């Protein structure tokens, strides 16, 4: 008795592309499963595109996977996962068919971007120290290369040659790109994430998410409280086998920025969450994510235990002693709703009655080490996140205190 895959070999070919890859030499590569028939190298096929049009193309190269590597083959049969090159504008969800039997499969819908950030050339005083790729040309080429395979991402050039607008499916989507780039040696800075708003029937609408959460029963209250403060609406609740509670929320996309780290903390790592785009709805109003100001560095230098000791009563610190800092860099969160400028590089003046090692006796409160996602949520519109292979630094857009005050005066 033949299996269904074996019997499909004798039918007309049909390949559904579910992923993309890219090679600098051969260009874009479509990855998909041969649903039926057999595909051969150099044979003509018809590509059924997502907009309903058809394009006659040829299989210039055909690959299959062996472990993690691609191996070139002459043919593949139904059931095989193949990689096909020679189609320059192929996209996910499109179908390759035999010219004699054009039957496209149902298209896979790709969610549109909901959140955008600006990627900029790093212009801080420490620019170029830690990164290998630092110029606007390097950053531009890397971002547009990402779009070749990451179909949910959009990259646009702006009026400034040093700034690129990158739109993605959410905070996690963009943070993965940022982390990947810094591991590859790129150095740049990013702005605060913003949701992509739309005008629908004369109303300003924002993207919504269906958030599905499973947590142990003892953490349900904390999760509902946090999501409620982020404009989340509980639409379904149930119990799973084993004592887990199933929760479903409808929540604005901006309400989930920075929440994943909070969720893991609130559930002690025992919770599971997943989100799906759920359309656009009228703007839900302001979501308060940070009511406090920033602790900003007064001058360039190295942080000292004495300087941090005199600053720690003003709020929460993000760095230890012995870290290089520059004017305008953010090193903590102020306890009040205002920015304060502190000199954390200040050291004791040595006298006959003060030993040089007296700083060691100062007792510092443990500092908070911020993750990438926490940094992305923390920054305000007048702040930036500096990303390098070795460091994540928060900073003001305008580094000079005098220039910031002039800007505030002009704004008033």
Locate predicted features.
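A short, contiguous, amphipathic alpha-helix enriched in charged residues
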Residues: 124-147, 365
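Conserved nucleotide-binding/hydrolysis modules and their immediate coupling elements
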Residues: 16-117, 127-129, 163, 292, ...
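Short, hydrophobic beta-strand segments
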Residues: 113-129, 160-167, 200-214, 240-254, ...
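Long insertion/accessory domains within large nucleic-acid-processing enzymes
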Residues: 65-73, 205, 251, 262-380, ...
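Short beta-strands and strand-coil junctions in structured, solvent-facing domains, enriched
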Residues: 23, 65-71, 90-92, 104-105, ...
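Conserved structured catalytic cores and adjacent interaction surfaces
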Residues: 151-225, 229-233, 239-246, 250-252, ...
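Single conserved hydrophobic/aromatic residue that forms the stacking wall/gate
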Residues: 1-6, 10
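Solvent-exposed alpha-helical segments within well-ordered globular domains of core cellular machineries
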Residues: 15-19, 33, 40-47, 57-64, ...
